[in-house]
Every structure is written in structure tokens, then in C-alpha cells.
């Protein structure tokens, strides 16, 4: 299975409009050109048309929007003002935006925010940023304007991991999903349950796999005990129960050590009767320490991408 090829085919079939927020970055401009040329999606590229032209790529079919001259800027400023109305700036103790004009001034300085506003207004289906902006600056507009899906309180991330040879001893289609490896440092049981449900949805909709979700720990079904005063295993057990209640249709179980989650012979030994043990393809790490280390080990030592 060629995951990227399959993903491109899905994108072509969907025919969505995507905002690329960083028209000042040569890589983003080239990507916009390729995406439109191959019919992967419709593209709105934010930036100055003259500056974008200097990169020398064919921009035929790419809609270039300069926020500073965009006729829709007032509409998007209104969207931002309403989304943040009543929010107080913690540093000044004053409202974030005194009026729509202040919201507009802020949006025109932050093209990632502008892209989020285009999406929020219904003029696009998604926005992409982060090529030349920090994680914090990339996430902030989404957190402030787009917010979370109904029923989900926790914003989280996940990594779709693809085997180097396209398949793996334990995962014949070569695809797994790891969450959350980048955002939530020490999630609570409730947050971990949200992460599990959201990651499973990504596994199904984007990775194209039927998720079998393993809630990871150093313990498998009570094999390990917490040190006094800690609740590391207990948190995962609670999160597992909460996730099952939130999404009873999911194949989800835990707590599992990684080998019990992925290796059939270990899963059968340590968690007999579990539909997930030994067959998991979607892995929920208990905190960002474990998740970040885990995906980088898979990438650097295992060659997963």
C-alpha cells in the first residue's frame, strides 16, 4: 500500500479548498503549484502576488489572496472579533480586541490567523501553516478561532507512521497512528480519553485504517503497580474506561505494554480475550514524554516515516 498515493487520491476525490498561509516560503509556493497542477485540491495562497511571482513557479489556478488588500478583510475581522468577544488579555487586563478595527489590525499581521478566519467563515475547508512558524504560533489561531469538534474538549495531535518497506511483521499494511506526541504534556484521564477518541477518528478518516486502539502503559492489565503517590497506571485505566464510554463502538482496550498491544503471542499471553491486544494499530501514549520518545525511536531506529 502506497499511503501517500492513496491519500492524494482521496484528496482529489474530495475536491476541497485549502488555505496555505505562508506565501513567503518558497516550499509552500511550490507546493501550491504542484497541488493545483495535479488536481489534489483547490488552493488559496496567502501573500503578495508580486513577491510570490519572484519564486518562478506556475501559479495558474492558484488563488492568491493578499490580506492587506483583500475585500473580505472586514468580514474576517468581524469573525475574529465575535470569536474572541469577552476574552481578556492576561497581561493588560483589557479585552483582547477593543473593537472590530483592532481585530482586523491583528489579523492582517498574522496570516495563519487570517487563514483560520477564512476557514471559520466557511470560505475554505482547511488551512495549513507551520513551514516557517513556530508550533505555538501555528496552533494559536486554531485554538482561538476553530476550536474543537463537538464532544471533544481536548486539542491533541497524532502522527501517522508508515513502515519503511510499506509493510511490517505486525502491521501488514504498514500504517500505525501514535497520539499524542506533541501537544499535551501530562494529560489527565479525561484528556487522555479525548485523545484516544480523536486519534481513532484520524486513523479511520485520514490513515484509512480500522482503528484498534491500545492505551499504553508500563503495565498490562494490572501487571505493574504505581509507586506511592503516583497514578500513572491508574490514570490509563481510568482513561480507558472513559474512552469506552465516550465511543463504545471503538475497538479500544488497555492498559497495555507496547509488546502486548502489537505482538499477538504476547497479547494472548498477557491479555487473553482482548480484541485489541496483539492486534493494535493505533497507540495512545500516557504523556508527551513517552509519545515523543516513542515516535522518534520508530523513525530513527525503525525507519518509519
Feature map (PLM): residue ranges:
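Anion-binding alpha/beta catalytic cores of soluble intermediary-metabolism enzymes, centered on
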Residues: 1-277, 281-305
Amino acid at each position: 500500500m502506497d499511503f501517500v498515493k492513496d491519500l492524494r487520491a482521496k484528496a482529489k476525490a474530495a475536491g476541497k479548498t485549502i488555505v496555505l498561509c505562508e506565501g513567503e516560503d518558497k516550499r509552500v509556493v511550490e507546493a501550491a503549484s504542484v497541488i493545483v497542477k495535479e488536481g489534489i485540491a483547490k488552493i488559496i495562497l496567502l501573500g503578495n502576488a508580486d513577491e510570490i511571482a519572484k519564486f518562478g513557479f506556475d501559479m495558474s489556478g492558484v488563488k492568491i489572496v493578499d490580506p492587506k488588500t483583500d475585500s473580505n478583510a472586514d468580514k474576517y475581522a468581524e469573525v475574529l472579533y465575535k470569536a474572541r468577544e469577552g476574552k481578556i488579555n492576561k497581561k493588560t487586563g483589557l479585552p483582547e480586541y477593543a473593537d472590530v478595527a483592532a481585530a482586523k489590525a491583528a489579523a492582517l499581521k498574522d496570516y495563519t490567523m487570517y487563514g483560520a478566519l477564512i476557514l471559520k467563515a466557511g470560505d475554505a475547508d482547511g488551512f495549513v501553516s507551520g513551514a516557517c512558524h513556530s508550533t505555538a504560533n501555528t496552533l494559536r489561531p486554531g485554538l482561538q478561532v476553530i476550536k474543537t469538534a463537538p464532544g471533544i474538549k481536548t486539542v491533541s495531535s497524532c502522527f501517522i507512521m508508515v513502515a519503511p518497506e510499506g509493510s511490517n511483521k505486525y502491521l501488514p499494511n504498514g500504517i500505525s497512528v501514535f497520539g499524542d506526541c506533541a501537544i499535551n504534556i501530562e494529560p489527565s484521564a479525561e484528556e487522555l480519553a479525548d485523545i484516544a477518541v480523536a486519534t481513532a477518528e484520524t486513523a479511520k478518516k485520514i490513515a484509512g485504517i480500522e482503528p484498534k486502539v491500545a492505551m499504553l502503559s508500563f503495565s498490562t492489565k494490572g501487571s505493574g503497580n504505581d509507586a506511592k503517590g503516583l497514578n500513572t497506571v491508574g490514570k490509563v485505566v481510568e482513561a480507558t474506561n472513559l474512552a469506552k464510554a465516550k465511543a463504545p463502538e471503538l475497538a479500544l482496550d488497555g492498559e497495555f505494554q507496547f509488546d502486548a498491544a502489537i505482538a499477538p503471542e504476547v497479547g494472548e499471553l498477557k491479555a487473553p480475550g482482548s480484541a485489541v491486544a496483539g492486534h493494535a494499530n493505533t497507540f495512545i501514549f500516557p504523556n508527551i514524554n513517552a509519545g515523543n520518545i516513542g515516535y522518534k525511536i520508530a523513525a530513527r531506529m525503525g525507519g518509519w516515516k
